[in-house]
Amino acid sequence: MLIRSIFFFTILIFSTCLSSNENIKHHYHKNFNQIKKLAQKINIDAPGTFYCGCKIFWKEKKGIPELNSCGYHIRKNANRANRIEWEHVMPAWQFGHSKSCWKKGGRKNCIHDYNYQKIETDLHNLQPVIGEINGDRSNFMYNQFPKSTLNGQYGQCSMKIDFKNKLVEPPDISKGAISRIYFYMSDFYHFKLSKKQKKLFLMWNKKYNVTNWECMRDNLIFKIQGNHNPYVYSKCQKNNTNKNI
Protein backbone atom coordinates (compact mmCIF):
# COMPACT_ATOMS: atom_id res chain seq x y z
CA MET A 1 0.00 0.00 0.00
CA LEU A 2 2.86 2.40 0.89
CA ILE A 3 4.64 1.68 -2.41
CA ARG A 4 1.42 2.23 -4.34
CA SER A 5 0.81 5.55 -2.55
CA ILE A 6 4.35 6.73 -3.29
CA PHE A 7 3.94 5.73 -6.96
CA PHE A 8 0.77 7.76 -7.39
CA PHE A 9 2.13 10.71 -5.40
CA THR A 10 5.15 10.84 -7.70
CA ILE A 11 2.98 10.66 -10.80
CA LEU A 12 0.63 13.31 -9.40
CA ILE A 13 3.49 15.77 -8.94
CA PHE A 14 4.89 14.97 -12.39
CA SER A 15 1.46 15.31 -14.01
CA THR A 16 0.92 18.68 -12.35
CA CYS A 17 4.21 19.92 -13.75
CA LEU A 18 3.25 18.75 -17.21
CA SER A 19 -0.14 20.41 -17.01
CA SER A 20 1.32 23.77 -16.02
CA ASN A 21 4.35 23.79 -18.32
CA GLU A 22 3.43 21.84 -21.43
CA ASN A 23 -0.21 22.83 -21.97
CA ILE A 24 1.12 26.13 -23.34
CA LYS A 25 2.35 24.38 -26.47
CA HIS A 26 -0.01 21.39 -26.38
CA HIS A 27 -2.04 21.46 -29.59
CA TYR A 28 -4.72 19.30 -31.17
CA HIS A 29 -6.01 18.73 -34.66
CA LYS A 30 -9.63 19.40 -35.54
CA ASN A 31 -9.86 16.75 -38.25
CA PHE A 32 -9.50 13.10 -37.29
CA ASN A 33 -8.19 12.35 -40.78
CA GLN A 34 -5.35 14.79 -40.13
CA ILE A 35 -4.48 13.08 -36.89
CA LYS A 36 -4.40 9.68 -38.61
CA LYS A 37 -1.69 11.00 -40.93
CA LEU A 38 0.35 12.08 -37.93
CA ALA A 39 -0.30 8.76 -36.21
CA GLN A 40 1.13 6.97 -39.25
CA LYS A 41 4.19 9.21 -39.15
CA ILE A 42 4.73 8.35 -35.49
CA ASN A 43 4.18 4.63 -35.94
CA ILE A 44 6.08 4.16 -39.21
CA ASP A 45 8.76 2.19 -37.34
CA ALA A 46 6.42 0.42 -34.92
CA PRO A 47 7.54 -3.19 -34.34
CA GLY A 48 4.06 -4.44 -35.21
CA THR A 49 0.34 -4.02 -34.72
CA PHE A 50 -0.60 -3.03 -31.19
CA TYR A 51 -2.43 -6.14 -30.03
CA CYS A 52 -1.14 -8.96 -32.22
CA GLY A 53 2.35 -7.83 -33.17
CA CYS A 54 1.89 -8.37 -36.91
CA LYS A 55 4.42 -6.57 -39.08
CA ILE A 56 3.01 -3.55 -40.88
CA PHE A 57 3.62 -2.64 -44.51
CA TRP A 58 2.95 1.05 -45.11
CA LYS A 59 1.85 2.02 -48.61
CA GLU A 60 1.30 5.76 -48.95
CA LYS A 61 -1.58 6.59 -46.57
CA LYS A 62 -2.53 2.98 -45.93
CA GLY A 63 -1.18 0.35 -43.59
CA ILE A 64 -1.38 -3.35 -44.44
CA PRO A 65 -0.81 -5.94 -41.70
CA GLU A 66 1.26 -8.98 -42.64
CA LEU A 67 -1.06 -11.52 -41.02
CA ASN A 68 1.26 -14.49 -41.55
CA SER A 69 4.01 -12.78 -39.58
CA CYS A 70 2.06 -13.19 -36.35
CA GLY A 71 -0.06 -16.24 -37.18
CA TYR A 72 -3.25 -14.21 -37.30
CA HIS A 73 -6.40 -16.10 -38.26
CA ILE A 74 -9.26 -14.11 -39.76
CA ARG A 75 -12.34 -14.62 -37.62
CA LYS A 76 -14.97 -13.22 -39.94
CA ASN A 77 -14.19 -9.93 -41.71
CA ALA A 78 -11.42 -10.46 -44.27
CA ASN A 79 -11.70 -6.94 -45.66
CA ARG A 80 -11.00 -5.21 -42.35
CA ALA A 81 -8.49 -7.88 -41.33
CA ASN A 82 -6.27 -6.83 -44.20
CA ARG A 83 -5.98 -3.17 -43.31
CA ILE A 84 -4.63 -1.09 -40.44
CA GLU A 85 -7.11 0.99 -38.48
CA TRP A 86 -6.52 3.43 -35.63
CA GLU A 87 -7.77 2.15 -32.32
CA HIS A 88 -8.76 4.42 -29.45
CA VAL A 89 -7.36 2.42 -26.54
CA MET A 90 -9.83 4.22 -24.31
CA PRO A 91 -12.85 3.91 -26.64
CA ALA A 92 -14.51 7.01 -28.05
CA TRP A 93 -17.72 5.82 -26.42
CA GLN A 94 -16.16 5.87 -22.96
CA PHE A 95 -15.05 9.50 -23.19
CA GLY A 96 -17.90 10.70 -25.41
CA HIS A 97 -21.22 9.04 -24.58
CA SER A 98 -21.99 11.31 -21.62
CA LYS A 99 -21.60 14.50 -23.68
CA SER A 100 -24.72 16.27 -24.89
CA CYS A 101 -23.55 16.16 -28.52
CA TRP A 102 -23.26 12.36 -28.34
CA LYS A 103 -26.70 12.00 -26.75
CA LYS A 104 -28.23 14.04 -29.55
CA GLY A 105 -26.60 12.24 -32.46
CA GLY A 106 -23.79 9.92 -31.48
CA ARG A 107 -20.12 10.25 -32.30
CA LYS A 108 -20.63 12.00 -35.64
CA ASN A 109 -22.55 14.76 -33.90
CA CYS A 110 -19.52 15.60 -31.73
CA ILE A 111 -17.19 16.62 -34.56
CA HIS A 112 -17.71 20.29 -33.71
CA ASP A 113 -17.40 19.86 -29.95
CA TYR A 114 -13.99 21.32 -29.07
CA ASN A 115 -13.51 19.38 -25.84
CA TYR A 116 -14.49 16.11 -27.49
CA GLN A 117 -12.13 16.76 -30.39
CA LYS A 118 -9.22 17.33 -28.02
CA ILE A 119 -9.75 13.90 -26.53
CA GLU A 120 -10.51 12.06 -29.78
CA THR A 121 -7.35 13.33 -31.45
CA ASP A 122 -4.94 12.73 -28.56
CA LEU A 123 -2.11 10.73 -30.13
CA HIS A 124 -1.26 8.97 -26.88
CA ASN A 125 -4.58 7.12 -27.11
CA LEU A 126 -4.25 5.98 -30.74
CA GLN A 127 -2.65 2.69 -31.77
CA PRO A 128 -2.36 0.85 -35.12
CA VAL A 129 -4.37 -2.36 -35.05
CA ILE A 130 -5.73 -4.97 -37.43
CA GLY A 131 -9.06 -3.58 -38.65
CA GLU A 132 -11.03 -6.68 -37.74
CA ILE A 133 -9.74 -6.45 -34.16
CA ASN A 134 -10.72 -2.80 -34.02
CA GLY A 135 -14.25 -3.64 -35.13
CA ASP A 136 -14.62 -6.65 -32.86
CA ARG A 137 -13.27 -4.87 -29.79
CA SER A 138 -15.75 -2.02 -30.34
CA ASN A 139 -16.16 -0.19 -27.02
CA PHE A 140 -15.78 -3.31 -24.85
CA MET A 141 -13.98 -2.87 -21.54
CA TYR A 142 -10.69 -4.63 -20.78
CA ASN A 143 -10.74 -7.61 -18.45
CA GLN A 144 -8.73 -10.64 -17.35
CA PHE A 145 -10.13 -14.08 -18.20
CA PRO A 146 -9.17 -17.56 -16.98
CA LYS A 147 -6.33 -18.95 -19.11
CA SER A 148 -8.51 -21.62 -20.71
CA THR A 149 -11.15 -19.12 -21.87
CA LEU A 150 -11.70 -18.04 -25.49
CA ASN A 151 -8.40 -19.33 -26.85
CA GLY A 152 -7.71 -19.34 -30.60
CA GLN A 153 -10.29 -16.80 -31.76
CA TYR A 154 -7.65 -15.13 -33.93
CA GLY A 155 -5.14 -17.91 -34.43
CA GLN A 156 -1.82 -17.27 -32.70
CA CYS A 157 -2.87 -13.75 -31.76
CA SER A 158 -4.11 -14.21 -28.21
CA MET A 159 -6.73 -11.46 -28.31
CA LYS A 160 -9.81 -12.70 -26.42
CA ILE A 161 -13.22 -11.13 -26.94
CA ASP A 162 -16.34 -12.09 -25.01
CA PHE A 163 -19.04 -10.73 -27.31
CA LYS A 164 -21.88 -11.78 -25.02
CA ASN A 165 -20.59 -9.89 -21.99
CA LYS A 166 -18.84 -7.16 -24.01
CA LEU A 167 -15.44 -7.73 -22.44
CA VAL A 168 -11.96 -8.17 -23.92
CA GLU A 169 -8.61 -9.42 -22.72
CA PRO A 170 -5.71 -8.19 -24.86
CA PRO A 171 -2.47 -10.13 -25.41
CA ASP A 172 0.23 -9.69 -22.79
CA ILE A 173 2.38 -7.61 -25.15
CA SER A 174 -0.10 -4.72 -24.99
CA LYS A 175 -1.32 -4.87 -21.38
CA GLY A 176 1.34 -2.61 -19.90
CA ALA A 177 0.87 0.08 -22.55
CA ILE A 178 -2.91 -0.10 -22.14
CA SER A 179 -2.69 0.49 -18.40
CA ARG A 180 -0.44 3.50 -18.83
CA ILE A 181 -2.64 5.00 -21.54
CA TYR A 182 -5.73 4.61 -19.35
CA PHE A 183 -4.06 6.25 -16.36
CA TYR A 184 -2.92 9.12 -18.60
CA MET A 185 -6.38 9.63 -20.09
CA SER A 186 -7.99 9.45 -16.67
CA ASP A 187 -5.64 12.06 -15.20
CA PHE A 188 -5.35 14.41 -18.15
CA TYR A 189 -9.06 14.55 -19.01
CA HIS A 190 -10.45 13.85 -15.55
CA PHE A 191 -12.17 10.56 -16.28
CA LYS A 192 -12.93 8.47 -13.24
CA LEU A 193 -11.93 4.82 -13.52
CA SER A 194 -13.88 2.17 -11.66
CA LYS A 195 -12.24 0.37 -8.74
CA LYS A 196 -12.13 -2.76 -10.88
CA GLN A 197 -10.39 -0.95 -13.72
CA LYS A 198 -7.85 0.67 -11.39
CA LYS A 199 -7.02 -2.66 -9.80
CA LEU A 200 -6.57 -4.35 -13.18
CA PHE A 201 -4.44 -1.56 -14.63
CA LEU A 202 -2.29 -1.29 -11.52
CA MET A 203 -1.53 -4.98 -11.88
CA TRP A 204 -0.73 -4.68 -15.58
CA ASN A 205 1.39 -1.57 -15.08
CA LYS A 206 3.46 -3.32 -12.43
CA LYS A 207 3.79 -6.63 -14.26
CA TYR A 208 4.53 -5.34 -17.77
CA ASN A 209 7.27 -2.71 -17.89
CA VAL A 210 7.68 -0.11 -20.61
CA THR A 211 9.31 -1.27 -23.82
CA ASN A 212 11.90 0.63 -25.84
CA TRP A 213 9.21 1.26 -28.45
CA GLU A 214 6.87 2.79 -25.85
CA CYS A 215 9.61 5.23 -24.92
CA MET A 216 10.40 6.07 -28.54
CA ARG A 217 6.72 6.55 -29.32
CA ASP A 218 6.25 8.82 -26.30
CA ASN A 219 9.11 11.02 -27.51
CA LEU A 220 7.72 11.18 -31.03
CA ILE A 221 4.30 12.20 -29.73
CA PHE A 222 5.90 14.85 -27.54
CA LYS A 223 7.59 16.40 -30.57
CA ILE A 224 4.26 16.67 -32.40
CA GLN A 225 1.66 17.09 -29.67
CA GLY A 226 3.74 18.77 -26.99
CA ASN A 227 3.17 16.53 -23.98
CA HIS A 228 4.41 13.25 -22.56
CA ASN A 229 2.40 10.46 -21.01
CA PRO A 230 3.91 10.72 -17.49
CA TYR A 231 3.19 7.06 -16.76
CA VAL A 232 5.40 6.13 -19.70
CA TYR A 233 7.91 8.96 -19.43
CA SER A 234 8.73 8.42 -15.75
CA LYS A 235 9.46 4.73 -16.33
CA CYS A 236 11.56 5.51 -19.39
CA GLN A 237 13.58 8.02 -17.40
CA LYS A 238 14.09 5.47 -14.67
CA ASN A 239 15.23 2.91 -17.23
CA ASN A 240 17.31 5.56 -19.01
CA THR A 241 15.60 4.73 -22.31
CA ASN A 242 13.99 8.11 -22.91
CA LYS A 243 16.64 10.69 -23.74
CA ASN A 244 14.34 13.48 -24.85
CA ILE A 245 14.71 16.73 -22.84
From Swiss-Prot:
Signal sequence annotation: none
Transmembrane region(s): none
Enzymatic reactions: Endonucleolytic cleavage to 5'-phosphodinucleotide and 5'-phosphooligonucleotide end-products
Molecular-function GO terms, alphabetical: deoxyribonuclease I activity
Domain of life: Bacteria
InterPro entries xrefs: Endonuclease-I, His-Me_finger_sf
Keywords: Endonuclease, Hydrolase, Nuclease
EC number: 3.1.21.1
Protein role: Has double-strand break activity.
PANTHER family the UniProt entry points to: ENDONUCLEASE-1
UniProt similarity note: Belongs to the EndA/NucM nuclease family.
Full protein name: Endonuclease-1
